[in-house]
Amino acid sequence: MLRPQGLLWLPLLFTSVCVMLNSNVLLWITALAIKFTLIDSQAQYPVVNTNYGKIQGLRTPLPSEILGPVEQYLGVPYASPPTGERRFQPPESPSSWTGIRNATQFSAVCPQHLDERFLLHDMLPIWFTTSLDTLMTYVQDQNEDCLYLNIYVPMEDDIHEQNSKKPVMVYIHGGSYMEGTGNMIDGSILASYGNVIVITINYRLGILGFLSTGDQAAKGNYGLLDQIQALRWIEENVGAFGGDPKRVTIFGSGAGASCVSLLTLSHYSEGLFQKAIIQSGTALSSWAVNYQPAKYTRILADKVGCNMLDTTDMVECLKNKNYKELIQQTITPATYHIAFGPVIDGDVIPDDPQILMEQGEFLNYDIMLGVNQGEGLKFVDGIVDNEDGVTPNDFDFSVSNFVDNLYGYPEGKDTLRETIKFMYTDWADKENPETRRKTLVALFTDHQWVAPAVATADLHAQYGSPTYFYAFYHHCQSEMKPSWADSAHGDEVPYVFGIPMIGPTELFSCNFSKNDVMLSAVVMTYWTNFAKTGDPNQPVPQDTKFIHTKPNRFEEVAWSKYNPKDQLYLHIGLKPRVRDHYRATKVAFWLELVPHLHNLNEIFQYVSTTTKVPPPDMTSFPYGTRRSPAKIWPTTKRPAITPANNPKHSKDPHKTGPEDTTVLIETKRDYSTELSVTIAVGASLLFLNILAFAALYYKKDKRRHETHRHPSPQRNTTNDITHIQNEEIMSLQMKQLEHDHECESLQAHDTLRLTCPPDYTLTLRRSPDDIPFMTPNTITMIPNTLMGMQPLHTFKTFSGGQNSTNLPHGHSTTRV
């Protein structure tokens, strides 16, 4: 059958229409696919516009079903490279860039010399010193151009937060100011679980970060200024990442914690953060501040051929040296101290940290701080040769070495040594070497960490500033640590960053259990709650039922605020509880008694009537024959320090002849240790009473003389106020010089020696050779708020504003 010719075009038209429709559909599908690809690409590689240019990060899923994905922005510059003429100078803002900067890989770390032979092992965590091969992978790319930070941004919204902006937590890594990098700590888990933005930073270390000549040639504290510059960058740019610049918390462990503590005392960091978490270290620790920077700078300059007399020429020579030559020099600091670290420059750190705390300079910040149960493990681990504990000789040697290096004055050293041994002997089990080992760990823990932390907490809480204290009692099972060890220095770090939730890593190679996962969730909840509200209990409740069926005992615990009277703290462990007065007796021993005991023999010179040394005491004791004191305490390598300008100490105590009327120090005693301690305490109280009586008598006599004076002409009150302020801010070094001068002038008059008592200030942290000395160019630590004074650092200036009269100190800018 034939089709009509008029209908022949219909199939052709239909075919054409189908082809056109298919083409359009194909194009539409292709465009849609491209669009979704671009969206997915943007989600996978997000781009953020900062004040200095655009950066592209990486969206990273985490290996746990309870953790959401995190955006990572790695190697973001926060300052210009501190190279060339910028070496030994404060940091400067970074340069802008065009286009999109790749921020998916870490940048170079700050120069450091990771040699196991020269590390300060006692001050570093075990996971750090036993993982040097792993750490080398993090620090192998070193460069002076190292001022970069890493940002971890969670993707999920917080149902407990109404504020769309997320709180920010900035981690300052530790490492005895000489080692470490922010790159080795992954903030992804903490950011995801706690729904906060976590930022880790690199800052200049060691010689490049803290070298100081003690004058204007090289002021020091460049590492601290790097941290402050990072905080300034965060304040300016964190909003682009969804962060709240008004809710910034800085936190750190070890040397990082002491940096955090120092930043709370510096005017340079005002307004850059609101809260601080101080883990195992404060500005009051003996190793927190370098009191003799010029000494170690001279040693370095001599080693590299830059030992010019003029400090400006010396620093210029050091600037021209290759950084590798500088950091590879071996400079050993005094035991329990540092060679290159923060210094009191009169500007960034305007005065001694204890004085600044007493003035209330850190009351603007909410603070959470604490210690681990066995911080002093590394000090003892090197002494013990096996698992059997500590022998009596090892114990005696450790105490003797400790006293010689921290309190190396000849006056009262024997009394102090015996008192410490008495305090740290478990008299119910004194023959047990394992008990002896435990008490020795406690000695170093209390002195280096606990006493400074409690003192810091007391000073911060005395005016009602929010303060929370914790004691960390848990540690993971690991072959890196001896089986007898408690929670050591740095053991809290993996729990803070949620490492148990993803399992062992090369850096934290522990056998994590469900209990470890639960405790890590608890710690992260406390830390991030504090960052959100300043209260570790709010807004997120403790709930870990999703981890295992065991009840979470932290649900029933309310972490109470710390105050100097009750001293409440949270025991963080598998059996949590709120307790009070953490190691109060030992803390009082170090803070109240020891500062008087270490110079006690000078007091004995006033009251003793002994004219010659008694014969050796061979009295029989239940545990053997009593030896002479010369054999009781093993000698150390540190030589005894002979007092200058005091001839009576140079006399031979065994010299025969006519009776010597010079009062001598009794070096051999026939009374027991208990009686020695009792007499020591009694003599201290007697000495203090004499001082108090003398002060009262002086005031009464002065008032009597003033009543007979004629009224003086009216004076210029403006000049008086200026004069009072100048006196008030006199530097610690100048005070020390005046004190020494007064004492020297009085040494010729024995009857007046009671009017010149030893200077007990800050004895917890000073070593014998750490007494500040003055040179023509020495910084005198005058705050830059004085009218007409120029700040020592040009990094940032502060106007001398009017202070509130309600503050604890006239120069304080903080709240009560």
From Swiss-Prot:
Database matches in PROSITE patterns: CARBOXYLESTERASE_B_2
Compartments where found: Cell membrane; Postsynaptic density membrane
GO molecular function: cell adhesion molecule binding; neurexin family protein binding; scaffold protein binding
Segments of skewed composition (Basic and acidic residues): 649-658
UniProt keyword list: Cell adhesion, Cell membrane, Disulfide bond, Glycoprotein, Membrane, Phosphoprotein, Postsynaptic cell membrane, Signal, Synapse, Transmembrane, Transmembrane helix
Residues annotated as transmembrane: 677-697
Biological process per Gene Ontology, one example term: vocalization behavior
Annotated segments matching region Interaction with NRXN1: 359-364
Cytoplasmic side: 698-816
Glycosylation sites: N102, N511
Entry membrane topology: Single-pass type I membrane protein
Role: Cell surface protein involved in cell-cell-interactions via its interactions with neurexin family members.
Family: Belongs to the type-B carboxylesterase/lipase family.
Subunit organization: Homodimer. Interacts with NRXN1 in a calcium-dependent manner. Interaction with neurexins is mediated by heparan sulfate glycan modification on neurexin. Interacts through its C-terminus with DLG4/PSD-95 third PDZ domain.
Protein name: Neuroligin-4, Y-linked
